[in-house]
Design a protein with these regions (language model features):
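Nucleotide-activated sugar donor-binding and catalytic core shared by glycosyltransferases
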Residues: 1-254
Length: 254
């Protein structure tokens, strides 16, 4: 989402959320991810009620930029749960209570096997495509991804492109595909089918994010992409301190 564009709307939602939580009077506030929203809620709530205990799951990416945020965060978050072990030193350094709990994608047990050939009865190699999990991301990336497929089709006729979606965005993705009249594309939204389709894929193209972990776990070569508007790009470029944009490359340091 374009945070800069929607800053006033977001601020209003934060205040509404803080009020609703305060009226509910919980003993513990448990926030998950989305630090631009959840941590602001926790901070404002803590000011109004210093006795409430706060726990946050999925640490903000202080290893990418603004490492100094930890000093501020520990003033209103009592305990933070970490996805990656390499994050721990950043919070230990500031004596902030934290715990490495792991990432669900890396810990999940294997599911029952599904024969992908029963789903796609076509003797062609699969390329998995992950266009994002928000409307704004899909709207930005689908035209780029479909142009990529059209270019590939000019030289290679042996691939089927599988768009991985949720039921919520299935129709949106399908509408983009139909608008370009590309026949060798499929869209799937069933999680078990998606998992095994990825494992059968020879390649993947994905929007930067958690999905890159799943792709890596499946040992599928990939291209990771992201596109932001020019104003956001200028701001982020001056603040980001890591060399890589993909969590896998950041973890590996190469």
């Amino acid at each position: 989402t374009n945070v800069i564009k929607n800053i006033f709307k977001i601020n209003r939602k934060i205040n509404d959320t803080v009020k609703a939580i305060k009226d509910f009077k919980p003993d513990i506030l448990f926030t998950v991810d989305s630090p631009d929203f959840t941590l602001r809620v926790a901070e404002r709530l803590k000011k109004k009620d210093p006795n409430i205990k706060t726990v946050h799951y999925v640490a903000p990416q202080v290893w990418v930029w603004r490492e100094g945020r930890v000093k501020k965060i520990k003033n209103f978050i009592d305990h933070i749960l970490l996805l990656f072990n390499f994050e721990k030193p950043y919070f230990d350094k500031e004596n902030m209570s934290n715990e490495f709990v792991g990432h669900p994608l890396l810990d999940e047990s294997s599911e029952g096997k599904i024969d992908i050939n029963q789903i796609f009865e076509k003797n062609k190699a699969l390329i998995s495509i992950f266009p994002g999990s928000r409307t704004s991301e899909i709207d930005v990336l689908m035209p780029i991804l479909l142009d990529f497929i059209k270019l590939m089709n000019k030289n290679y006729q042996d691939f089927i492109y599988i768009f991985h979606s949720t039921k919520q965005y299935y129709d949106l993705i399908q509408s983009y595909i139909k608008s370009k009249n590309i026949s060798n594309c499929e869209t799937i939204s069933d999680d078990k089918i998606k998992s095994h389709t990825l494992k059968k894929s020879v390649f993947a193209v994905a929007k930067s994010g958690t999905v890159s972990l799943e792709i890596c776990k499946s040992k599928v070569p990939s291209i990771i992409l992201y596109k932001m508007n020019f104003l956001n790009y200028l701001i982020v470029r001056s603040l980001v301190k890591v060399k890589f944009a993909n969590i896998i490359n950041i973890s590996a340091g190469k």
